[in-house]
UniProtKB/Swiss-Prot annotation:
It comes from Pseudomonas aeruginosa (strain ATCC 15692 / DSM 22644 / CIP 104116 / JCM 14847 / LMG 12228 / 1C / PRS 101 / PAO1). Coiled coil: none annotated. InterPro entries: Aldolase_TIM, Methyltransferase_A, rRNA_lsu_MTrfase_RlmN/Cfr, rSAM. [4Fe-4S] cluster binds at C108, C112, C115. This is Probable RNA methyltransferase PA1839.
Amino acid sequence: MRSQDLHQRLADLGAKPLHCGRIVRAWLQGRALDACTARQRAEDFLPLGVRHGLPQVAAELEGIARLHSEHPASDGSSRLLVELADRQMVESVLLPRGGLCVSTQVGCAVGCVFCMTGRSGLLRQVGSLEMVAQVVLARRRRAVKKVVFMGMGEPAHNLDNVLEAIDLLGTDGGIGHKNLVFSTVGDPRVFERLPRQRVKPALALSLHSTRAELRRQLLPKAPPLSPEELVEAGEAYARRVDYPIQYQWTLLEGINDSLEEMDGILRLLKGRFAVMNLIPYNSMDGDAYRRPSGERIVELVRYLHSRGVLTKVRNSAGQDIDGGCGQLRARATQGTAERRIPARQA
């Protein structure tokens, strides 16, 4: 089901645009579809046919996604394993201070070598209302004021559905445009389409290395943009929407944590409208990668920050409960057969 399908479903019951707006807003806030306002009861506002049909609509919306399990962590985050209607699983993460990270695909075709999600390949796309349903489930647990499309999947490979979800959350969902974050490895279509949207989200770009060859090794199926081209495209978008690009850098000991790489970051980002997020690697079973020591991470942050690049450390939420992206899903689906599909282009 997509957004237009929901509106058509309500229209078939006799709902006018004003009625649809209230019903959709109630759902997006995690409330009952016939939730009244302080000044008006549902029976005084919604047509009889709509009121009679709402229980069935509510059941259909509940069937889009359900909470399979919740895993609170010591850092205040909570990982949600969400089961979709076809029994596929995706993850979303409730973050401290009102944030939520949602998944846009079941699996991923990019195949980043340090990501658990990429190991399964792409299984299927997540629909726009399946993304929104992750927000609804989260809002029933705590307030959500920021949504980052940074969970399982590459949003650029499911662009139509992601942009539709962003539009819905940025309008009827009541989330500020700067608090909607589109994360991508850097697909040219993103830079073409995002500036034309009614809701223009913040942008996070996966950099991970300033050396083109190493970046290709780390992100083997990412579009062939050089680090320089990626930063130029990001800067143009940042200046257009007037908020900075977040550059993502997963810190891998002995691979991309050298001073040579840090000098490359300074070369690319100094003077840019940008924030560098250093993300210490979250170890997975059976892999050869490690995060640098805490002392080394502090050293790198100080090196960049003191030379003019705003730098933050972003630890993966819920590290004590298999917090790496895709790890909960991998554990839940262990032993089940899965079929990979090629990425559907937007």
